[in-house]
Amino acid sequence: MPVLGSQRRLLGSLNCTPPATFPLTLAPNRTGPQCLEVAIPDGLFLSLGLVSLVENVLVVAAIAKNRNLQSPMYYFICCLAMSDLLVSVSNVLETAVMLLLEAGALAARAAVVQQLDNVIDVLICGSMVSSLCFLGAIAVDRYISIFYALRYHSVVTLPRAWRIIAAIWVASILTSLLFITYYNHTVVLLCLVGFFIAMLALMAVLYVHMLARACQHARGIARLQKRQRPIHQGFGLKGAATLTILLGVFFLCWGPFFLHLSLIVLCPQHPTCGCIFKNFNLFLALIICNAIVDPLIYAFRSQELRKTLQEVLQCSW
């Protein structure tokens, strides 16, 4: 559980900067220059967590309800929603306990609070790792479906998908336990940062290659229809925009947190890095925002899933 106040503590003692007292303040660092510090109110954390919680519960419920959605691709999307769901549950639980403790409505011994803090940290770290893994798995699944379409159902089988899903969850749990235990070791932090960079590179390479193939296919159709420029340019712009949104959201939501981890290793005492450390809460809020955006990008674009969601909302089980 974080230290009471506006500055949260995640994954042990990753951040030890003093709490901010205003929504937007300029906090001086040790050398005198001004640091821009954005404080995120607990109410905003709670609201973001609840929105993400509802969205991802709906995704999981829709996939569980509709047999047509029970395929490897949708299982990966479902697991991504479950990972984001863990982020939301951890955030809501953490914020609720913080507010109750601050209000004096909950009395707990320090040892109990510490144990609860450890559980929440494991949930948050595990959900982060699993989210990144399933984002990568979805990218690989889409790549195979495009470049190996005829062999897709023999390559991406249900048993193989289940083994991949099980391996990701086990690896995420072990990683979170190791990270919580050895969070103050440089190697552990660098491994996490390296993992993020690897996932970003994997997604960028696969999606760029898929966009290139799609544009090539569009050019072929355009030549047959003798309308090369309008079709190709329009399709290319639409594909580039989709790719920019997909990778941009991923980088903007996850990048600042892993930048924070990198700077802990590279310049823990430097004043400029100290300015970045002060915005740790903002980085956590961005991760929660990613849990809100993921269903919009990966799940709600499916017409079949949207139709099932309507049935779920109407309680027509």
From Swiss-Prot:
Residues bearing glycans: 29
Subunit structure comment from the entry: Interacts with MGRN1, but does not undergo MGRN1-mediated ubiquitination; this interaction competes with GNAS-binding and thus inhibits agonist-induced cAMP production. Interacts with OPN3; the interaction results in a decrease in MC1R-mediated cAMP signaling and ultimately a decrease in melanin production in melanocytes.
An MF annotation (GO) of this entry: melanocyte-stimulating hormone receptor activity
Organism ancestry: Eukaryota, Metazoa, Chordata, Craniata, Vertebrata
Membrane topology label: Multi-pass membrane protein
Extracellular side: 1-37, 94-118, 184-191, 267-279
Described purpose of this protein according to its UniProt entry: Receptor for MSH (alpha, beta and gamma) and ACTH. The activity of this receptor is mediated by G proteins which activate adenylate cyclase. Mediates melanogenesis, the production of eumelanin (black/brown) and phaeomelanin (red/yellow), via regulation of cAMP signaling in melanocytes.
Protein name: Melanocyte-stimulating hormone receptor
GO CC term, one of those recorded: plasma membrane
Alphabetical keyword list: Cell membrane, G-protein coupled receptor, Glycoprotein, Lipoprotein, Membrane, Palmitate, Receptor, Transducer, Transmembrane, Transmembrane helix
